[in-house]
Amino acid sequence: MWGQRLFAGTAVAQSVSFPGLVQMDEDTHYNKVEDVVGSHVEDAVTFWAQNVSKNKDIMKIGCSLSEVCPLANSVFGNLDPKKIYGGLFSEDKCWYRCKVLKTISDDKCLVRYIDYGNTEILNRSDIVEIPPELQFSSIAKKYRLWGLQIPSGQEVTQFDQGRTFLGSLIFEKEIKMRIKATYQDGTVIAQAEYGTVDIGEEVAKKGFAEKCRLTSGIDACEAKKPDPNQLALRSLKNPIPLWGRRSNQSTFSRPKGHFNGRLTLDVKYETSAGNHVTFPKESLAAGDFNLGSNVSLAKIKQDQKLIEENEKLKTEKEVLLENYKALELKVEQTAQELQQEKTATMDLTKHLESTLKTCVGTRLKNLAAKVELLKEIRHINISIRFGNDLSDAMQVLDEGSFTTLASLNELEKIWAEYNVAQEKIQTCLNENEGNILIAERNEVQQKLFVAVDVFILEVDDLPLDKRLKTLQDLATSLESVYGKAKEGTNNSEETLRKFYDWQCTKREEFASIRSETEASLQHLVAWFQSSQKVFDLSLDEPLTSEDLIGNIDEILEKTESCVCKELELSLIEQGVIDKEIILSTYSQVLQKIHSEEKFIATLLSKYKDSVEFKKQMIDCLNKNPNVDYLLSIKKTLKGLKAQLRWKLVEKSNLEESDDHDGTEIEKIKQEITQLRNSVFQEIYHEREEYEKLNSLTQKWFPELPLLYPEIGLLKYMNSGGLLTMSLERDLLDTEPMKELSSKRPLVCSEVNGQPVLLKGYSVDVDTEGRVIQRAASYHRACGYAKEESGLLPLIFLFLCKSDPVAYLMVPYYPKANLSAVQASMPLTSEEALKVMKGVARGLHTLHSANIIHGSLHQNNVFALNREQGIVGDYDFTKSESQRASVNAMVGGLSLLSPELKTGKPPSASSDLYAYGCLFLWLSVQNQEFETNEDGIPKVDQFHLDDNVKSLLCSLIYFRSSMTAEQVLNAECFLLPKGKSVPIPEKEIECTQHSREDESKMESLDRYSEKTRNGEANP
């Protein structure tokens, strides 16, 4: 690309208008002559040229673009091919006017620089909008040589050669164009002349073009004209010669002149307003030709050769100039470095001169400071560096270790035989075989008793407590020094051998260095003592100073070296290998300590068991436990139940007689009440005796169920102490609970002043055992946690003798389930938190025992005193899956988790989902729920406490990672520090009185229609 480039510092500092350029004269007349300068060549017959009269206009355009384009916005969207834009030319980074010929991709376009004719592919970021005053016709015109066309089938190489040849004839030269015609796209057909040379004829002579046939004329040439876009792309792929790619452009602002008919080169530089304006050195001054002179093709070639030589010389000059500047910079840097070295050398010389004056004093002071430090270090115990404490610890372990005990081995052997004998008795079902096993067990028992006695006596003589205290102190001391031990260390003997070898080597090295230090210091002291004679003027005997003084420098050097070596060994941190050896040994020592501690703990535990065994066996040896007391209780119960039945019949007869006495009936009622209390008192005594026998059976006498099948001990044990054979329904004063009996028989009664419910379960031979087993599992889980279980306790389980019904007795809390509480007086947010924390505790108790509730809903969750939440029991005749298959609803919200709806088995996660829905129902009161397509409620629609909302989201949306224990520890359930829940005494009294009233007056109250379909205690 040639022509005027942008001037970074042009004098034009204001906007420029272009009168006369807005509408260019496109009217051409036949044989009209124009003087133009070639700017770009497309092929052997087509080129672009600028009118020589537009020189100043090109300069103005460049100045304006240099001011406008850097601040303009890059184009976006679809580009208008008719619109003029500003384009950043890649070779000189200057702005020129251009039009978009083709969009190559989303971020690249093919453009033509309209004032020069050349093309380029630009990024969109290099194309900008320009103002309307720059939107006028192009300076350059497209010309086509008259009467010529590109031969059909021309090869690429010949095409490029023709393009290059035409460029050598017209590029940056002033030529005359005789206009013959104009195409519709604006291409001017003209005859080109350079002096006396007909450029078209020269091109045709070279064979790069052929003359059009006379019959076709302009139309034939038009038909041969290639697609301009294809020419543009081909021009990009085959760039024009060197003159088409120069970074400097020829300008027409330079004056023209003649020097004896020869061409002149414009090499002058101009400045304007203090800024550097560059004019080309190599461009030929257009218009310097005498059009009447004889110019030959040889002259043109000579000019071209001069241009190429000039370009080459210019390049060499620039390289030499750059080398010169680089060498000049290097010389300056070397001079600076030399000056810095001189300064540093002078400073060092001054420092040495000043230090030499005090060299001896400074050296002795430093040595004295090091010796003083060495004294302190020698007083400090540095045994840790050589593992002396580990050696001492291993000596302690070896001297008084307890690693084995002969009596313990014998005891464990006999105890194992004893346990096997007990297991055989426990699994025996035949009484005769059982007697044989009992006799064998008793023999082993005698041997065990003797072994226990020997073991106890031997352990009593051992100082176990003292040894354990020594080991604990030793471990604490080592851990304070070495920290955490390595895990997984093996091959203790190899580790200890390496440690002893390393320790010996280090001790020898340290002893050698220490002796060298002491010897060098003694040598220095001896020198000071001997040198006193040399400097003592009172001595008359002649002394040779050279012999007495000796080489003090060598003595000082030796002393300093030895002292520094010992300091380095004492102070510098140990190496990786040393640390590895010490830590491995420490780990082995600690393992031995813990191993012996574990052995002593085993001894003490076995000693405790042996003492207990000996104590109990002294009372039980060769003597079976007595069940007579249990049988007497059963006999007493039998009599009391007979009296109670008789009194019930007597009361019934009196009530049915016509002349019954009310006083006598009341007296009988009191007697019945006393008899019932006596019956339950004896039942509780019976349970206590069963519990004692159960404990003896578990520990010492597994034969009790086999020897005394009549007492039913095995059934009691299998039920976890819940089953009783002494209780019958007709002994209780019951009232039917019809409103709660939609699913099973349900009656209310009172035991020892406490209202209870009797739940009836229809059972047969197959289901009876499963009901007992499920109830026993629930009862055991409740018993493990005791008062903190969060579960509704089970009081008794008994079987009806006349009907296939199993009755379960549980406490009765009238109107305490969540359904009734929310219907009468809804819980506040604080009360709901207390209640749901208790419910979470109940679920945690069940889940810890691997029990899935599967039937959690508002009718079997209770709010006692509106602050204690407990989880009710469930239907023990049903499995987990059967219980979970019932779709309970609360407030229009299903408590069935999404996984249960898809047929998956119930799990702790499904219990937590029901819990979360109940918690949400309590938190939002009567607000309506929005659910997604799976029926899961949307929690975000409600305004809740942040901690409560976080817990609900975890329960409802992310249950797979939640447990009941995590729910218990949720932020919303944690009380602020120093704050407790008050329980006033008056409130307790009121609660007790209300319970008494409810047990008598409200047991037959009807629930509302909302609770009629559920159960208070399912």
UniProtKB/Swiss-Prot annotation:
* Stretches assigned to the Protein kinase domain: 711-1018
**Gene Ontology cellular-component terms listed:** acrosomal vesicle; cytoplasm
Q: Identify the EC number(s).
A: 2.7.11.1
Per the record, what are the reactions this protein catalyses? L-seryl-[protein] + ATP = O-phospho-L-seryl-[protein] + ADP + H(+); L-threonyl-[protein] + ATP = O-phospho-L-threonyl-[protein] + ADP + H(+)
* Domain Tudor residue range list: 78-137
> Where is the region Disordered?
988-1018
Q: Which GO terms describe its molecular function?
A: ATP binding; protein kinase activity; protein serine kinase activity; protein serine/threonine kinase activity
Q: Which portions of this protein are annotated as coiled-coil regions?
A: 298-358
Tissue expression remark: Testis specific. Expressed only in male germ cells.
Q: Which UniProt keywords apply?
A: ATP-binding, Coiled coil, Kinase, Nucleotide-binding, Serine/threonine-protein kinase, Transferase
Which SMART domains does the record cross-reference, listed alphabetically? S_TKc, TUDOR
A Pfam family annotated for this chain is Pkinase
Q: Where does ATP bind?
A: 717-725, 738
Which protein family is it in? Belongs to the protein kinase superfamily. Ser/Thr protein kinase family.
From the Swiss-Prot or TrEMBL record, give the protein name. Answer: Serine/threonine-protein kinase 31
Source organism: Mus musculus
